[in-house]
Amino acid sequence: MSKGRVLITGGAGFIGAHTAVELLRTGYDVRLLDNLMPPIHTGEWPRWLPDCERMLGDVRNREDWQRALRGVEYVVHLAAHQDLLPNFAQFFHVNSVGTALLYELIVAEKLPVRKVVVASSQFVYGEGRYRCAKDGEVFPDGRAPERLAKGLWEPV
């Protein structure tokens, strides 16, 4: 007997796919939603991923959300655009607007979603080392524990 149906957005990603494995192992039905877009993906689902429902779709698309949320009790929202540059608009649209659309649909359509789990972005680790023509080598710090404790996840 299933413990319930879980939708994992970003389900083809590293964290999403491994979350699916664990949820399947512990008795949940799993539905994955992913756009399988490069450069993160090759356009195919991971071959090692266990058998579960897979949906090609985009969290920026209302119809994809509606289709993916049908019959779902739990959402693990991991879908994210990972590169801030060179396309900040796409980064914002996927990461912020896509998440807002999830909550908008749950409320507006009175969906029976019992719990939503949202993960932070990789920004909590800092931007990594890079070379800037003006400033030379730059290696920004990670996020200070004090900021993280206050829920201030993103850089200022």
Tell me the role of every PLM-derived stretch:
Residues 1-156:
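N-terminal Rossmann-like NAD(P)+-binding domain of SDR-like oxidoreductases, especially those catalyzing
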